[in-house]
């Protein structure tokens, strides 16, 4: 039987040393599932609420005992004894139990931990890998990684205004080959930065955080490292950006503190379009601020047919905001972060809506991560073809890459690599 017999919540630490939630779900047949919840540094205003204790005597107010108490008490009381395979029904109960639009009463961190641990427990009971349990027989596409090798913005203590500069091994034949490519470029970039006198400290997501003056300077270093490592920019390896523009959008303008420049909405869109023409940039995430719909429309009209434009803060994995954006013709892709919405069922619904509208989907980590590798399985389960899970250092990031290597090995000849076709802009 897959009846839920126990749910145990606990407070653990994430990759930034902040508390987060971990949940164990035990079933009657002895099966068990465990999930840990990530957290973000640059968070969208419309995300589901991560419940913190606000007790300044513990972890500077960042403790999650309230969320843990909700898991061990109210949530277990509501779903204990239910069949773990009834994922959608249980997720609906959890949403109703919270009773708020943004999961602020029980906390999205509490609800998500239970939702994901539940899926893992059910998969364990059926002796199935998570990607197969969630995705069925068609789950076999290994994603192209977006490897964040230079960090800026709120992810690093340097002057670079953009948050992430990523490489995508679109020309690789397999995931493992793509991972090797990324690793070789990462180590080459380290050597090149060091040779030029820059520090090689890493940011929250494992990328380097050098004191470079502009986005172009960072892109030039990355282009050089790609060539030096023996790869061809644009053919073997494409570039992707995450400006996280909401972080520097002030009073209707984009304020580049590091560069000492201010750009209007139109200037911001045209600046990004120029970068995309000057470099082999195939994906830009959050190039405009989350509520700058005018800017998003302008950017989409400018380069939406040739570049993947990913909405993260714009959509926050929320079907209501996604439907609104689709209707307005904003972006052409959605970033999928499970903790932005708070249940597995709602996450899968967002992916499905994106696909139906002809949008791509990118499975994503958060800057505050754990060793939990659920998103690797979800990337394969949804066949989304793209994953964003950090750089080639820090074990919290490598955990996801290593899980994808295992999945590729398990799938054997069935495995397919997303490659160039994963991005509609390149297909």
UniProtKB/Swiss-Prot annotation:
Active site: 205 (proton donor), 337 (proton acceptor)
Entry EC no(s): 4.2.1.11
Associated pathway: Carbohydrate degradation; glycolysis; pyruvate from D-glyceraldehyde 3-phosphate: step 4/5
GO BP term (any one): glycolytic process
Matches recorded under SMART domains: Enolase_C, Enolase_N
Cofactor note: Binds a second Mg(2+) ion via substrate during catalysis.
CDD domains (alphabetical): enolase (cd03313)
Matching PROSITE patterns: ENOLASE (PS00164)
Gene3D superfamilies given in the database record: Enolase-like C-terminal domain, Enolase-like, N-terminal domain
Cofactor(s) annotated in UniProt: Mg(2+)
PANTHER family: ENOLASE
Subcellular location: Cytoplasm; Secreted; Cell surface
List of residues binding Mg(2+): 242, 285, 312
Catalytic activity: (2R)-2-phosphoglycerate = phosphoenolpyruvate + H2O
Function, as annotated: Catalyzes the reversible conversion of 2-phosphoglycerate (2-PG) into phosphoenolpyruvate (PEP). It is essential for the degradation of carbohydrates via glycolysis.
This protein's name: Enolase
Family: Belongs to the enolase family.
Record-level GO cellular component terms: cell surface; extracellular region; phosphopyruvate hydratase complex
Gene name for this UniProt entry: eno
GO terms of molecular function: magnesium ion binding; phosphopyruvate hydratase activity
InterPro entries: Enolase (IPR000941), Enolase-like_C_sf (IPR036849), Enolase-like_N (IPR029017), Enolase_C (IPR020810), Enolase_CS (IPR020809), Enolase_N (IPR020811)
Organism superkingdom: Bacteria
Cystines in this chain: none
Organism from which the protein derives: Nitrobacter hamburgensis (strain DSM 10229 / NCIMB 13809 / X14)
């Amino acid at each position: 039987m897959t009846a839920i017999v126990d749910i145990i919540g606990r407070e653990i630490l994430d990759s930034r040393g902040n508390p987060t939630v971990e949940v164990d779900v035990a079933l009657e047949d002895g099966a068990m599932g465990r999930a840990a919840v990530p957290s973000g540094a640059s968070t969208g205003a419309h995300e589901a609420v991560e419940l913190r204790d606000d007790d300044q005597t513990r972890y500077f107010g960042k403790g999650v005992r309230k969320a843990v108490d909700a898991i061990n008490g109210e949530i277990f009381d509501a779903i204990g004894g239910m069949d773990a395979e009834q994922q959608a029904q249980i997720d609906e109960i959890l949403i109703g139990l919270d009773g708020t639009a943004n999961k602020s009463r029980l906390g999205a961190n509490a609800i998500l931990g239970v939702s994901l641990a539940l899926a893992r427990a059910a998969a364990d009971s059926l002796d199935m890998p998570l990607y197969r349990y969630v995705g069925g027989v068609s789950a076999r596409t290994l994603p192209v990684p977006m490897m964040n090798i230079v960090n800026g913005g709120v992810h690093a203590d340097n002057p670079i205004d953009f948050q992430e500069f990523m490489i995508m091994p679109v020309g690789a034949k397999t995931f493992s080959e793509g991972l090797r490519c990324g690793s070789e470029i990462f180590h080459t970039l380290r050597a090149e930065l060091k040779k030029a006198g820059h520090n090689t400290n890493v940011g929250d997501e494992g990328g380097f955080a050098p004191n470079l003056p502009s986005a172009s300077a960072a892109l030039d270093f990355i282009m050089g490292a790609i060539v030096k490592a023996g790869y061809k920019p644009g053919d073997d390896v494409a570039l992707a950006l995450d400006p996280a523009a909401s972080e520097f959008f002030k009073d209707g303008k984009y304020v580049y503190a590091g560069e000492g420049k201010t750009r209007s909405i139109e200037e911001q869109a045209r600046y990004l379009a120029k970068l995309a023409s000057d470099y082999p940039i195939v994906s830009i995430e959050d190039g405009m601020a989350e509520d700058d719909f005018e800017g998003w429309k302008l950017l989409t009209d400018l380069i939406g047919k040739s570049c993947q434009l990913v909405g993260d803060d714009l959509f926050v994995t929320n079907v209501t905001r996604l439907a609104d954006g689709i209707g307005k013709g904003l972006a052409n892709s959605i970033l999928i972060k499970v903790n932005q919405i708070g249940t597995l069922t709602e996450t899968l619904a967002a992916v499905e809506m994106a696909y139906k509208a002809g949008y791509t989907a990118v499975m994503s980590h958060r800057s505050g991560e754990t060793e939990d590798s659920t998103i690797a399985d979800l990337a394969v389960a949804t066949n989304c073809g793209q994953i964003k899970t950090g750089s080639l250092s820090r074990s919290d990031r490598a955990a996801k890459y290593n899980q994808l290597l295992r999945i590729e090995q398990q799938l054997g000849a069935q495995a397919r690599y997303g490659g160039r076709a994963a991005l509609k802009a390149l297909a």
